[in-house]
Amino acid sequence: MMHRIDPSKLELEERVVTINRVAKVVKGGRRFRFAALVVVGDKNGHVGFGTGKAQEVPDAIRKAIEDAKKNLIAVPLVGTTIPHTINGHFGAGEVFLKPAAEGTGVIAGGPVRAVLELAGVQDILSKSLGSNTPINMIRATVNGLSELKRAEDVAKLRGKSVEELLG
């Protein structure tokens, strides 16, 4: 991530992925709180995720949205899909992302689908490998999306034209 993306300039849509009741065991019993996992995106190449924890669900969601807006990344899109195949990793979670032909749709499960749809990807094939914990799947997906590069960018780095690069 080179520079921070200003969330106030984007029309962000948010999606709650999971809400989890967590407990802290104290002498008098259990203290319950809620942990929320939220994905935000503008469906035009920007996406972020965040977590929030509070005593009430709406507060946890609000905190998660604020956190997600601080963690926005830019996703390079080629038409309605991604530039190339990539594997995203986080912990024991791994997500395989592969570009798809127009009209394929988003073939992804649960948390991965939320990230891809809000990033603006309309055609993609994906497979979740390893850990299926929502937070790990989202982090692995965001990791994969952040490592994507356009052919023009790679050609510029190597000092070649796109035609030379693609052969």
Swiss-Prot record:
Record-stated family: Belongs to the universal ribosomal protein uS5 family.
Domain of life per record: Bacteria
InterPro entries documented for this protein = Ribosomal_Su5_D2-typ_SF, Ribosomal_uS5, Ribosomal_uS5_bac-type, Ribosomal_uS5_C, Ribosomal_uS5_N, Ribosomal_uS5_N_CS, Ribsml_uS5_D2-typ_fold_subgr
Cross-referenced Pfam families, in alphabetical order? Ribosomal_S5, Ribosomal_S5_C
Entry protein name: Small ribosomal subunit protein uS5
* Source species: Bacillus cereus (strain ATCC 14579 / DSM 31 / CCUG 7414 / JCM 2152 / NBRC 15305 / NCIMB 9373 / NCTC 2599 / NRRL B-3711)
Keyword RNA-binding listed? The answer is: yes
HAMAP family to which the protein is assigned, alphabetical:
Ribosomal_uS5_B (MF_01307_B)
SUPFAM superfamilies, per the entry: dsRNA-binding domain-like (SSF54768), Ribosomal protein S5 domain 2-like (SSF54211)
Domain notes per entry: The N-terminal domain interacts with the head of the 30S subunit; the C-terminal domain interacts with the body and contacts protein S4. The interaction surface between S4 and S5 is involved in control of translational fidelity.
Where in the numbering of this chain does the S5 DRBM domain appear? Answer: 12-75
| Oligomeric form and interacting partners | Part of the 30S ribosomal subunit. Contacts proteins S4 and S8.
- GO biological process: any one? translation
Might you report a single GO cellular component term? Answer: cytosolic small ribosomal subunit
Q: Name one GO molecular function term.
A: rRNA binding
Q: Which UniProt keywords apply?
A: Ribonucleoprotein, Ribosomal protein, RNA-binding, rRNA-binding
Q: Sorted alphabetically, which NCBIfam families does this protein's record hold? A: rpsE_bact
Q: According to its UniProt entry, what is the function of this protein?
A: With S4 and S12 plays an important role in translational accuracy. Located at the back of the 30S subunit body where it stabilizes the conformation of the head with respect to the body.
